[in-house]
């Protein structure tokens, strides 16, 4: 494979599975497993554009919520059920996350997203990786 092909076919990291909270459980009381994927640059930029006037925290919430595979916070049935339960209109993954999570759970979700996407890597860390 030449260099050109390597740039066209990057080896993306697999989705991660994690337990967000022991308050979301199955019928046996076992904590539910959540799954997160990487967003494409186009997805991330669109989410950022749509939330730019809402502040950094809202952008991060929207990114983290949109990256979830399980549960799918864009599922129309889930959004309708959350709207009915919360007596407010829930239209987006970010609104769904805020409707169903506690503040501690929301912070943990943002932390998982931040860590998974390696958003905290410094330029020095990236340069060190390139040298190895």
PLM region descriptions:
Residues 8-25:
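Short acidic, Pro/Gly- and aromatic-enriched capping/linker segments at domain boundaries
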Residues 27-132:
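Short, surface-exposed, charged amphipathic helix/loop patches that serve as local interaction elements
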Residues 1-13, 123-132:
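Low-complexity intrinsically disordered segments
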